[in-house]
Regions:
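Vicinal oxygen chelate
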Residues: 2-27, 35-131, 138-144
């Protein structure tokens, strides 16, 4: 692997730079609505939102969730990017307080799929599915 790859953005990187290692780029129906929902459910901070096109779609929404970038786009089937429902993955959200993050997500409209609980591997863990079909896994330290 190259020595030039780094997790953190280099010093002097402009505001709005991508934060984190691997960044999820989700194709959802209603990317701007999804971004608004993530503000409520996951305390997302908008970094950049491309204006919608004449059909109400946007090609790019950049958010920060818990200090890391998450990106969204509407499907553009005419450009080879059709809508495909989320399946076979979850977004892991490492947090200090699993219960409060999970509860905020559920209160905002996520479906509870696994209540917060202390797991055999040593973490506290919970899951919820958002209205756009994405499963979120909150993980953090066990309750004291």
């Amino acid at each position: 692997m190259s020595d030039t790859l780094t997790k953190e953005a280099p010093a002097g990187t402009p505001e709005g730079a991508i934060k984190g290692g691997i960044v999820a780029y989700l194709s959802v129906e209603g990317a701007i609505r999804c971004g608004d929902f993530y503000k409520k459910a996951f305390a997302a901070q908008p970094v950049h939102i491309n204006p919608p096109d004449e059909q109400g779609r946007t090609m790019h929404v950049h958010l920060l969730i818990n200090g890391n970038s998450v990106m969204l786009s509407d499907p553009y089937p005419e450009h080879g990017c059709p809508y495909v429902p989320a399946a076979g993955f979850s977004l892991m959200l490492p947090v200090a307080n699993v219960d409060s993050w999970w509860q905020r997500a559920v209160d905002a409209g996520c479906t509870a799929t696994m209540q917060p609980q202390d797991m055999f591997w040593g973490d506290r863990y919970a899951q919820a599915k958002d209205p756009f079909g994405v499963t979120w896994a909150c993980v953090g330290p066990k309750k004291a």
